[in-house]
Amino acid sequence: MTLPHSPGSAGEPQASQTVQVHRLEHRQEEEQKEERQHSLQMGSSVQRRTYRSSEEEQQFSSEDYALAAALALTASSELSWEAKLRRQTTTVELEERGQRRVGFGNDLERMELAFLRTQRLLRQRRDWKALRQRTEEKVREAKELIELCSGRGPWFWIPLRSHAVWEHTTVLLTCTVQGSPPFQVTWYKNDIRIDPRLFPAGKYRITNNYGLLTLEIMRCTVEDSATYTVLVKNAYGQASSFAKVLIRNYLGKDAGFDSEIFKRSMFGPSAEFTSVLKPIFAQEKEPFSLTCLFSDDVLEAEQRIQWYRDGRLLRSSTRRQILYADRQASVKVSCAYKEDEGFYTIRVSSPFGPQEQSAYVFIRDAAAEKPGAPGSPLNVRCLNVHRDCLTLTWVPPSDTRGSTITGYSIEMCQGDSEEWMPCLKAPGGTCRCPIQGLVEGQSYQFRVRAISKAGTSLPSKASEAVVTGDYDAVHKSTEIPYDLGSKITISKNDFEDAVTIPSAPTNVHASEIREAYAVLSWEEPRPRGRAPLTYTLEKSVIGSGTWEAISTETPIKSPRFALLDLEKGKSYVFRVRALNQYGMSDPSEPSEPVALKGKPATLPPPAQVQAFRNTQTSVSLAWEPVDGGSELLGYYIYSREAGASEWQTVNNKPIQDTKFTVPGLRTGKEYDFCIRSVSEAGVGESSAATQPVRVKQALATPSAPYDFALLNCGKNEMVIGWKPPKRRGGGKILGYFMDQHDSVESDWHPVNRQPIPSRVCKVTNLHEGHFYEFRARAVNWAGIGELSAPSSLFECKEWTMPEPGPPYDVRVSEVQATSVMLQWEPPLYIGAGPVTGYHVSFQEKGSEEWKPVTPDATSDTHLRVSDLQPGKQYMFRVQAMNSAGLGQPSVPTDPVLLEDKPDAQEIEVGVDDEGQIYLAFEAPEAPDFPEFQWSKDYQGPPDPQRVEVEDEISKSKVILKEPDLQDLGIYSVVVPDADEDTSASHTLTEEELNKLKKLSHEIRNPVIKLISGWNVEILEQGEVRLWLEVEKLSPAAELHLIFNEKEIFSSPNRKINFDREKGLVEVIIQQLSEDDKGSYTAQLQDGKAKNQITLALVDDEFDKLLRKADAKRRDWKRKQGPYFQEPLTWKVTDDCQVLLSCKVTNTKKESRFQWFFQKKEAPHGQYNPPTGDGSLSIEGFSKENQGVYRAVVSDERGEDDTVLDLTGEALDAVLTELGRIGALSATPLKIQGTEEGIRLFSKVKYYNVDYMKTAWFHKDKRLESGDRVRAGTTLDEIWLHILDPKDSDKGKYTLEITAGKEVRQLSADLSGQAFDDALAEHQRLKALAVIEKNRAKVVRGLPDVATIMEDKTLCLTCVISGDPSPEISWLKNDQPISFFDRYHMEVKGTEVTVTIDKVTSEDSGRYGIFVKNKYGSETGQVTISVFKHGEEPKELKKK
């Protein structure tokens, strides 16, 4: 290949090189400029001993060097020739470097160009000496200018500016003045000179720092509002500047440059978080979301709000949405996977720096398809992707659900098919597996399932899609840029020689050896030719001396192959051959011996696992890292409550750090933790469990006290009070250290050397008329807390006003949605008279108005404030009142948010195991060893003579010693050292106290709990069992059974059993008799517990029991032989038959079964000996079948019978049931045309007139039988006949069948086509009836056969009918008869007679009379047999 090359472009830098050259030039110029400035500055500040050379004419001072530095910066444009020179030199170097890198061009041409450039550089030299002389001249001119300008009056370079600030803040007035010689400075306030010595110490601070004048006014008050002027003057003149300072009352915002208004005006609004991210516990395959609220709208939210997971920036995807709307930012995941677990951080950029919040998201394992199956693997990744193979890795699951993982199954999805097919099972059970046999250029995804004896896990999240290909092709090509943006790509294959047979591959080696496989790698042959290559492998066992080809399903296209069929314990060597379309290469050199490794060992557990308290619901863990190198994938953490045996997984994604905070724990509970290392070999052994740690807030020093107030004041003493720290640090406040400061002094002095346990301190040895301020620090077990801000200045002046001083220590407790409880201490200064009451007022946050809680004053030092609005914040204050009026108000409380806390603790009232009535309160969120302050009726602690208080770790109990009406009232409790309100109250009423006393009596005088009182049962053989059940008793329990005031014991007829384990007492009487009548009392005693249960068996109850026992005994005796297991019963079948059935048991072959009806045997009854079933079926049951039915079974062991009386009510029941089933069997109404009209009918299987009633309706109007409508029934049919139907008969017809309570209705619509069809059928049948009536017919008379003796006269007579009269003809053997001689016919009306005189044998034959008219014809036939004299007729012979 040839490259485009021309003389004009030879050696010229390309576009990308040009950009680099310009950047390098610019950076070099900046560096040179900085070096010059630095050298000049160093010269101005450090005096060095220098020596003048022969060329130097003058030595410069430090001022000269400073001026020269400024002139050098302005003269940089004149030295541009130097930059040009360096730029050209750099260009030459880059060109030469580029030419060496590309490796093209003419060496002679490069040398000529370099020579010409060097000549040009030499010609551009300048005279350095002339340049130095010109610089010195400019320095002298500048010095003269300075001398001319040095003497002048002062003037303000930056004047004063006005300030408007909040009170108690500091104001700093500054200005900059220039002038020479130095000037005098004087400050004025409203034209009055300010002398700091005349004001309190530290009030004013005045400084003059080289022309920068400052006046600092400390802790401004409203009196500091004024016009401040600064006057400066020297010998040449004077100047002044003034500024106004406005002091505003503090409204809760910062002042000056820290104010919110200033920030927004300068930088725009800065949104703050108004909610806190909390840990999320989501489940695999389910959605979850993280939401954060802001105080203001976030401008350009897409750019300013960023979400991170484990430090990686998150972006929206198909499963993940990052949203912002309505001051709410959220990240929503539609389908969670374990890979989504981790630390989520929201970061919002602002002008004051980024704001962040973080929370951990836990992804729990989804429910397995089979119980006990392990959790799914995670982090499935594809590594070493080649043309036909890759390596798959994953992370083992943390939760195996008690069953060891034995292996992993891999599934594969090819392309966009979305069909997951089993790929293979990972060999060895490690978390790494080679995948082979892939198609080049195809996209693949993989997922993994864990396998254990309990089953297979759910699939992991699918890996990222990868496309197979030759990823080494990038390293085989070189890109050469030219012109502007163009480039040429040269592939190494382009330089391959035109060889046919490739050479042998080289460097055959095992790149990876595992327990179950080894990966063989090699380098392509050189030369290889341009034809595509494939490879074949051969193996040889060390010592065998033979080579065996390794068969593969597909050709090997990549220089890498995984060997999965190697045997453990053997060493192999391998060699490779290359193939192309021309042939096969020689084998490569054998590899080094390869043998499979043993099973990889898991990493050891981390050491020194320590658990520390963190918050009320979390614990911090820390441990030493495991030296696992790249094999370490992270750590799994497990937890359990102290005393539990089963460990619970904390995280499902390995943690990379060596510390972690476990959230979501139960406050006050103790937990153990252990950690396991994770690697590709699996999850390692558990570390040693930590010491049990209680979930509590970690100990820390408390925050600062605040809101100092003056409670009383004398001539030289003050009483100061304050509020406790908002954060107690998780421990009890042990006391306070207090400092005081006299405003005329500069130093602070401690008030006390030992901690003050209370929040009221009396400070003595003060100076009357002086102003003092105070500050304090709280102390707990962790140490001394933060120092508070100084209080306001309090004047030490004795109080003499008649009104009382302020109440103090106003406390808010029992906060609910609409009410709070206020308590306070009375004022220390009562004024002119005693305190007569207190005035309580409240203020809603954001309002400036104080409203009274009640119209009248309260005399108590507590008050429940009700009827407040939920969800709002309120502040409260109290004023004492005496005869002189209202006194000073107390310090307002902090804003209190009114809401019902779902997990708020309440006072528990009950009775303990010893029968003591108690009131208990548990505060799991309280600090260690909390103090519980109980009070009764808010008047102070309960009377110790009546109650006893017991405190535990986080629980306190008040025990009533002798409960009485004096103990009624309101019991309240407060935990003062808790950061949040931890309080409750309970009103103990008389009704509740009586219940508790009753329960206490039961506990102190225990009664054996009765589960079931006396029960009476009759056993199978007629024995009577008396039993009762109580709670489980100890082995020492005793039983005394009293019968009619006399203790009884077991006897042959009366057996007594006492099972203490089951609490069962039973008495079994073998044969009950009159001697057993009376009362039975069981007296039980188990330690102190007693009980007595009595059963009375007397009067009718005993007689009834006696009869039942005798009957049971007789029944048992009856069952010793064959007996009826099921008595005789009747049943109506669907065919309306009455079926009598019974069943016998305990029969044998000789047993006899009989049926009887009315004391007569019924032979048609049936009996099936194998099953014992007897049955008697009665068809067409009616009142004739009423009577007594009896079945008897007997053999030599005895006899038993069963009787069924089907008379009276029983008979009515059977017939009613027959009617009901008959009604249900009625078929739908059918319409039929008849000769007389139209007939509607329904078929039934049974009909009984007495027990089934029918009614017909036409158009919902009841029909009655008449001339045209007739209704009737038969045994199997119910019908309605409409005679001579007309159009008015059209409509809906309904048949109502009533059988007892069963009513059934059947309907048919006789209209339209149905009516027309029925009417046509009626007319057809009617016409056929007319024809049939008038047709010629032979009605009667002719016999079938007539026998006559010869010579007798035969007379045949028959009756005919027909209208009109029919024609008559006689036939003999189907031939007409001629009536003459011996044949005569006579017709008399409808009677026709044929006479044959003197019959002969020839007259024998078949005769017939044929009648005919217009409606039809008919033939009557008779056979005539003539026998001779003396012969017997044939008919008689046959007989």
From Swiss-Prot:
Sequence segments annotated as region (Disordered): 1-57
Protein's name in the database: Myomesin-3
Disulfide bonds: none
Keywords: Coiled coil, Cytoplasm, Immunoglobulin domain, Repeat
Residues covered by the Fibronectin type-III domain: 376-471, 504-599, 605-698, 704-799, 806-901
Originating organism: Mus musculus (Mouse)
Record's subcellular location: Cytoplasm, Myofibril, Sarcomere, M line
InterPro entries, alphabetized: FN3_dom, FN3_sf, Ig-like_dom, Ig-like_dom_sf, Ig-like_fold, Ig_I-set, Ig_sub, Ig_sub2
Subunit structure: Homodimer.
GO molecular-function terms, A-Z: identical protein binding; protein homodimerization activity
Basic and acidic residues composition-biased segments: 22-38
Tissue expression summary: Mainly expressed in slow muscle, extraocular muscle and embryonic/neonatal skeletal muscle (at protein level). Expression in skeletal muscle is fiber type specific, with the highest levels in type IIA fibers (intermediate speed) and lower levels in type I fibers.
PANTHER family named among the record's database cross-references: TITIN
Job of this protein: May link the intermediate filament cytoskeleton to the M-disk of the myofibrils in striated muscle.
